[in-house]
Structures are given as structure tokens and as C-alpha cells.
Amino acid sequence: MGFKVDLFEEEIVDNTKSYMFCPNHTSMIDVMVMLSVARNPFVFVGKKELTKIPIFGFFYKRTCIIVDRSNSKSRLAVFEAARKRLSNGLDVCIFPEGLVPDDESIVLSEFKNGAFRLAIEHQIPIVPMTFYDCKKRFSYTFFSGKPGKLRVKVHSFLSTEGLTLKNSDALKKQTYNLIYNELVNDLKKKITFSNISKIKK
């Protein structure tokens, strides 16, 4: 497809431990990027709608705990399944935004609580991840995007040791702010570079 993943890791996962991966979510290709950079076996918690996509859906179902967001029983069952995977030593990846926003001008949507509550319950680190280029390279808007580099940053882990569920909102906010600021700063760099290029011309 003409994509090359460029990975930068501030901290490297230990294959004897479990983690909760929390990347931003802007594109269908996010799932494939996550699979390409993961060092440990893991499962996604993912939405039912994506299973209907030809070819992609076939592989998606085999790497995901599927959630039907319109069904409260399904949501509860999903988190019970995630708990079992974590108890068995697997990592879990949850896109905490839940859905890709329809408005592509949104930098980062509000985070849901599930990933942070699960991480605290199991006392495992949050691994914030920034996907910089997936929206630009492979947007949900058809016939848009182009091949190129897909930059991924694994941020320093956020410990949940000693935290309780009362701390889940603060942990969620900390993770959100870290990824949001990273995306905004990257956008500022691109705007500055673009302006310099125009001046030189």
C-alpha cells in the first residue's frame, strides 16, 4: 500500500508484563499500524461495525474483542472478556476515543473511561501512543490520502500502581493531554515549516 511505519519509543515494553495500549484513533489503518509495532501478544477492544468491511473485517474479528456499542450487555461482556485476557497475561489495546470523529478537523475526541478503569483494576501501566499521520495517509473519507511515512510515538508509560477507580478520571485526563499536546505541537511544526517554504519561494 506504500506505507512505512516509523516508530519512536520513549520506553520499551517488557514482554513479561501486561500493558494497556491507548493510541489516538483517526483511520481504518490504525489497527494495522498497531499490529505492526506491537512487541507483545495483545487483543483489541473494537467496534462491531468494522467487522463488515471486506477482507479487513475478516482479520479484525480474529484480533479483537468485539463490542456492539448500542447494546449495554455487549459492553459489559466486552470488559469481562478483556479482564480475562489481562488475567492471562495478554496486553489489551483500546482506542479511548471510541469512534473516529466524522469531523476530520477534530484533533482528538473526548476519551471514554473503559481503558483507564481496566488498567487501574489490574494495576498495569497505560501506554499512551500517538499516531501522527494515519488520518492524512488513509482517511475515512474515500479517495483521499496518499502513500508515505506513518510516524508512531510510544510515550513513557503512566503507572497505575496504588491508584484506585477514584483516580480513573485524572488518569484519563493525563493520557488525553499528553497525546493532544503531542498532536498539536506536530501540527504547529508543519504550519511553521509550510510558511518558511512559502517565504523561500
Where do the PLM segments sit?
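Short gly/ser/thr-rich secondary-structure transition/capping motifs
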Residues: 1-8, 75-76, 134-137
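Catalytic core of membrane glycerolipid acyltransferases/transacylases, capturing the structured
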Residues: 1-2, 15-72
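Glycine-centered loop/turn motif at secondary-structure junctions
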Residues: 2-4, 64, 89, 123
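Generic preference for hydrophobic
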Residues: 7, 21, 44, 94, ...
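Structural signal for conserved beta-strand scaffold positions within catalytic alpha/beta enzyme cores
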Residues: 7, 44-46, 66-68, 128, ...
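Short coil/turn linker and secondary-structure boundary residues
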Residues: 8, 69, 163-166
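Glycine-rich helix-loop-beta junction characteristic of Rossmann-like nucleotide cofactor-binding loops
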Residues: 9-14
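Non-catalytic C-terminal accessory region of glycerolipid acyltransferases
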Residues: 77-201
